[in-house]
């Protein structure tokens, strides 16, 4: 029975029983505690907890699930998968244990003609929670199971939760006996290889708290109603119904293995365990990668993006270990599409994008693997030569930091060479790097990293932001901070306030000044005293949020004095705010235009907007074409000129998303959100920033450029409003100047410049040819005039200026070839560009037999010209910075050879 038929029978069975069929949710949900959806019931959690009323009493679904904690076990065993499909039926206060058991038993044992799976009832076993006598009784009544085929187990096995606080309850697992060839008799407590778990019925009745293990957590109490949550692994039941040994032989994964075997020209499952592991890694990870990309994840360096990157890189490396050097990821994605397409049509519809992203990661990683592998081989060899068995944390960190090697890849490669890795040392270096980054960020934001001084004010309540409605507000100073420390409350004229010339932070109870967030930088403005302190005035240079609720104004006190408790006037610079709103609204316009031109997968990855300028980062593989860039600019400006109304309103998060409002991926939002709408459906986003009231106020938007800022992430930069006009005026002036200099009309400038560039390149080529011909002539003369020191022929010569290291390597090979087979050494040094002094040394085999090493001689050159160098016995090179030492350097080489040749 094919997998798509297995899925259809499951859904049909429960729909006939009155359940509502619910589509699979994305594997990514807006839950900061959950990296990926890992169970079928996740999308129903609010119903189980009583937080929302379910629109149906019972439901059925087949949910895409991803679990990655056991990623290193994938392939080594045949039981682990990172992606799986969980078929489930759910009851929200409707039926309970009896109903769940009756429905499951019917589907498993009914004949194929009756819509069931036709399993042999005599081969079905179950387990129950150790004190669940009711479940034992029901299995006996409903299914007629004998007591010996109902086994009791503890909390770790038969009490289910998601692993985080939420719904939980005792469970009953259903197992199928695969026969004596898979293990000993005695039920699942004896062998879970022979007795394969195919279905788990969870009697969801409690709520759990925090915990550290599968058994160590507190039961908080009963749920508002008793629920049913069941999960049948589609891959597991397919294994049984297709009568194969493991999930890798089902119709879901075997096609991927066959694709790999065809390309590798090696058979799978012929007794080579290491190769079989690689086949299984490729099959599992390719499928998971396709699902992740399909659901909007792009390769990255943290979070979900890092998981995807790690999966793809394990695929690529496993393929190389199978002898596949050619690109294969595109073929793998196509095979996954063909195998999974009947169940997940989005993999077919979105295949071009999925394949493009996966192949781009393959291309990038191949470059990383080539350079990083060389370093790994060097450090592994060095470690072994020293007699050590552990690769240092420092080396692992260098591989990660410089070459992008995940620690997991280093661990795998080390294990293959018989080495361990100092993971503790590596993680300490990583933690130190993160600490430095955090400290730098905190220092940039607050000039100090300790935010505990603000705790009292944070606990007292939030700053009221008035800036959506007014640019000037009366406020009270709640606190004054200097260098991260709160200034004690004092009276005016008493030391301790904030006086003229000081740089301090003021916390107000209300403010119209926008605090940096959402990509929009902080407002600039003033804070002025009132009444007896009206002489006080401060310029606001930055505004930041503490704990998302407290506005901290960084100010320079220009006159007078501020004291905690003072009433002040906080005001935004109107010109600044006007520019800021243009920049932020322009960002929304560009985002909408990108999605219109490229499609909905151009997902925002970050932004920055300030008066007159915007920067927008988005997930996309490969550069935009000139036509696409022009289109984005045109669509943006057409929307600006359309004078769309900009409307802002608050809405419940679920309703806002249902309306199509775009949320920033990975961002955590409150239940009630602010929605910014521009031109009805043209742009609808969740946003807490300040905006223009109609799009015409944005002014022209000029895209400056589009570039890559990382694998799979592109950046668009643009000028907005007056800055756009100024930029265009500069461009016009530049073009006019070029046209005047070239004595052609403006429209002919590009062709004339192209012609000049072509002529210049031809001239440079000819100059280079003449220069190298001259150098080679000098090399011939140098070889002819080689001096003899003992029985060694030596060419030690200063070359003409402007020579590069590459030039010297080329010449040194020519000269060495002309010196014959007797002992010979060539040392060349030159004055390079920008005061560099490149040098190179070569020693032929006969010279090496005498003990002359090029890498030793290059050190003699390095000392005299204050340089560094290295290489091997036959060829070494380096570069110095003191051209006055060139003659001394050559003399040092002559002296060293004289010593070795024992001359004089």
Swiss-Prot record:
- One Gene Ontology cellular component annotation? plasma membrane
Positions with a binding annotation for Zn(2+) = 584, 588, 687, 691
**UniProt remark on cofactor binding:** Binds 1 zinc ion per subunit.
EC number assigned by the record: 6.1.1.7
Indicate the enzyme's highest-level EC class.
ligase
Q: Which biological processes are named by the entry's GO terms?
A: alanyl-tRNA aminoacylation
What are the alphabetically sorted keywords of the record? Answer: Aminoacyl-tRNA synthetase, ATP-binding, Cytoplasm, Ligase, Metal-binding, Nucleotide-binding, Protein biosynthesis, RNA-binding, tRNA-binding, Zinc
Quick check: keyword RNA-binding in the entry? yes
Name the reaction it catalyses: tRNA(Ala) + L-alanine + ATP = L-alanyl-tRNA(Ala) + AMP + diphosphate
| Gene3D superfamilies in the cross-refs | 2.40.30.130, 3.10.310.40, 3.30.54.20, 6.10.250.550, Bira Bifunctional Protein, Domain 2, Threonyl-trna Synthetase, Chain A, domain 2
Main localization category: cytoplasm
Q: Where in the cell is it found?
A: Cytoplasm
Listed GO MF terms: alanine-tRNA ligase activity; aminoacyl-tRNA deacylase activity; ATP binding; tRNA binding; zinc ion binding
Which cofactors are required for activity? Zn(2+)
Q: Which residues form a coiled coil?
A: none
* Miscellaneous note of the record: Was identified as a high-confidence drug target.
The free-text domain note is:
Consists of three domains; the N-terminal catalytic domain, the editing domain and the C-terminal C-Ala domain. The editing domain removes incorrectly charged amino acids, while the C-Ala domain, along with tRNA(Ala), serves as a bridge to cooperatively bring together the editing and aminoacylation centers thus stimulating deacylation of misacylated tRNAs.
Q: Which family does it belong to?
A: Belongs to the class-II aminoacyl-tRNA synthetase family.
What's this chain's function?
Catalyzes the attachment of alanine to tRNA(Ala) in a two-step reaction: alanine is first activated by ATP to form Ala-AMP and then transferred to the acceptor end of tRNA(Ala). Also edits incorrectly charged Ser-tRNA(Ala) and Gly-tRNA(Ala) via its editing domain.
Cited HAMAP family:
Ala_tRNA_synth_B
Which PANTHER family does the record associate with it?
ALANINE--TRNA LIGASE, CYTOPLASMIC, ALANYL-TRNA SYNTHETASE
Identify this protein by name.
Alanine--tRNA ligase
Q: Which organism is it from?
A: Mycobacterium tuberculosis (strain ATCC 25618 / H37Rv)
UniProt lists the gene as: alaS
